[in-house]
Amino acid sequence: MAQYKFETEVNQLLSLIIHSLYSNKEIFLRELVSNASDALDKLKYLTLSDEAYKQIKFEPRIDICFDDTANTLTVRDTGLGMNEEDLKNNLGTIARSGTKAFLDQLAAADKKDSNLIGQFGVGFYSAFMAASTIDVISKKAGENDVWKWTSDGKGAYDLEKVDDTAFPIIDGVPEGANGTCVILHLNNEDSEYATRWRIEEIIKTYSDHIAFPIYLHFTEKQYDDKGKVKSEASKTEQINDAGAIWQKPKSELKEEDYFNFYKSLSHDSQEPLLYVHTKAEGTQEYTTLFYVPSKAPFDMFHADYRPGVKLFVKRVFITDDEKELLPTYLRFVRGVIDSEDLPLNVSREILQQNRILSNIKNASVKKLLGEFKKLAENDKEKYNKFIAEFNRPLKEGLYSDYEHREELADLVRFKTTSPEVKEDEWTSFADYVSRMKSDQKAIYYITGEDEKTLRQSPHLEVYKQKGFEVLIMPDEIDDIIIPSLGKYKDWELKAANRAGSDKELNTEEETKEAEKKEKDFKPVLEKIKEVLGDKVKEVRFSKRLSDSPSCIVVDETDPSLQMERMMRAMGQFNTSAVKPILEVNADHPLVQKLKDSKDKEFVEDMSNLLLEQALLVESGELKAPVDFVKRLNRLMTNLK
C-alpha cells in the first residue's frame, strides 16, 4: 500500500466541502450516480467504436446497496473502470486550469453553493459531506488488475493493488466485472442515507432519467401482529425510469420531467430558465433538448470553459467535450443532440467538418434564437433575467456570427438615458428607434467602464439638453462589438464620446453661432495646446459641453481609451499610446479665467487640470497623480 498527498487544490476543495453547511447535502448521491452513468457511456462508446474493446461484453447497470448496521452506502457500476494512473489523476488531482479562481469563488460565496461543485466537475468529493471515509475499488475494462483507493479527506489517500474479492458481492453483478465501486462509511449524523426510502427519494428526484438501470438492493422484512420480524428476504428493484427523455414524445413529458433531467445533466440544483425540445425528421433525423440555466456557468468567460451539450448517435454517447456543437456565444446552453445519421465511430476531426452536424448546428442556432425572441415578446420579466446573465455572450455573437446578426441585434439589450425607462431596466435597439425624434439620423451610445460614471459623463450634456436618448454601454467588449455592427437597420450607430458625433445635434443657426465663437476662441485653444504639447492630439472648441469645463474624445479612427487599456492588458497593443482630443467649454468660468489670465503658471496649471480632470472622469486614473495634486493645491491656495 502506498500513500499519496492530495494536490493543494483538492485539499482546499475538501476543506470547503467538509467544513461548510450545505442545504442540499443529498446531491452527493446524484454526483456519484452521474459519474457511474458517465463511465457506462464511455464504455458503451468504446465497445462500439474501438477494436480493443469490442470483445468486452457490455452489461450496463448501476447498483446501490446499503447497510444500516454498518452505516455504509455503496454505489457500483459496470462501466469503464479505472487503473492506478486513472485513480491518481481523477481522484488525487484537479487537472483543470482556472481551479484557483473557482475555489476563490466558492470560498467567497455568502452561502456555500454545492451547485458550483457539480458544475466544476469534481462532484465525487461532495461525498465527503456525508462520509468520514471513502473506499473506491475499480477495475478497468480490458485489464486484470484491481485497485483500491481509500481516504478520509484529510490531505492524503492510500492506493493499493487488490483482487476481485475486494469487490462486494452484489446480486446481478457478474463476478469479476469491470467497473467501479464506491463505498461510503457514513457519518453518524448521516445514517438516513443508509435507508431505502431516502435513497429512492433522491434517485427519483435527481437521477430518474439516467439512461441505464439503477438497482436498489435491500432487505424486505415481514412482521407479525406483535411487531416482531417473522421473515426477511433480499430484494432488488430497479428504481429509475432509465429512458432517454429526449426521445420521448413531448406530450408524455411534464415540466417536472424536463427539470429533473436538467438537474441530472447539468449538476445544477436550480430549475432552468428555459428548455427547447425539438425532433427533426426528413432528410436528416435528429433530436435536440436544450436548456438555458437560471445562472451563468461559473466558467463562461474562461478560455477553457466546459461545453454544456452532449452528442449522442442513436442514443450512444459520443462526446461532451466538443465546443463546435454550438457557436461559442451560446456556450451557456446545456443539453443533448442525438443524431440518427452520424457514424458511431465519428472522430473529432470528422465532427468539425461533418455536413450533417453542421446542418444540425445551424438549425439549432435558429431554433434557440427564435425561442429567445418568443421569450422577449411574451415574458419580459423572465427575459430580463435571461439578459442579466447572458447579454454579453449574445453581444459576442454580433461580432462572430454574421449570418444571424440581425436576429441577435434584436435580442441584445442596453441601459439608456431615456426618462421613459428606469435605470435598472433594459431597452432594445427597436425600443430606442420607436422613441427617436422625427428628424434624428442616428442611434447614439456611449461606452466606458462603469454605468454610473457614464450616466454622469460630460459627453452627454448636449444630448440631455436637446432631448436625445443615449444607450449606456459599460461592457468592455462594447467598444469592439458596436463599431463592428456599424448600424441597426437603417440607422447608423454613433458613439457620443467620439469626435464629431455631436455635429448633427445643432441647428444651422446654432452651428453658425458656434463657428463664430470658435473663431474668437482660437487663441485660447492655441495657448492650451502649447502648454499640453504632445499629451493631446488636438485642443478643440466644444459644442457638446454646457456644465463641465472640458472633456476628452478620441478620433473616429482611433481606439477608445478603454479599448487601448484592454488590448494592452492582453499584450495586443504595441504601438504608442492613443492621444486624446481635448474639448474645452468656452463659456465655463474656469476657462474664462484662463482666457483672461496673463499669469504663466496659472495658465499652465489650469491647462493641465482641464486635461487631467477630463481624464479622471473618463478613465478614473492619471499617470502623474502627485503633479495633479500639486497643481490643485497651488490653485486653491490662490483662491480669493
From Swiss-Prot:
Domain of life: Bacteria
Keywords assigned by UniProt, alphabetized: ATP-binding, Chaperone, Cytoplasm, Nucleotide-binding, Stress response
Region C, residue ranges: 566-640
GO cellular component: cytoplasm
InterPro entries given in the database record: HATPase_C_sf, Heat_shock_protein_90_CS, HSP90_C, Hsp90_fam, Hsp90_N, Ribosomal_Su5_D2-typ_SF
SUPFAM superfamilies per the UniProt record, alphabetical: ATPase domain of HSP90 chaperone/DNA topoisomerase II/histidine kinase (SSF55874), HSP90 C-terminal domain (SSF110942), Ribosomal protein S5 domain 2-like (SSF54211)
Stretches for region A: 1-348
SS bond partners: none
GO MF assignments: ATP binding; ATP hydrolysis activity; ATP-dependent protein folding chaperone; unfolded protein binding
Annotated region (B), positions in chain: 349-565
Subunit details: Homodimer.
Protein task: Molecular chaperone. Has ATPase activity.
Stored NCBIfam families: PRK05218.1 (NF003555)
Name of this chain's protein: Chaperone protein HtpG
Source organism per UniProt: Treponema denticola (strain ATCC 35405 / DSM 14222 / CIP 103919 / JCM 8153 / KCTC 15104)
Gene name of the encoded protein: htpG
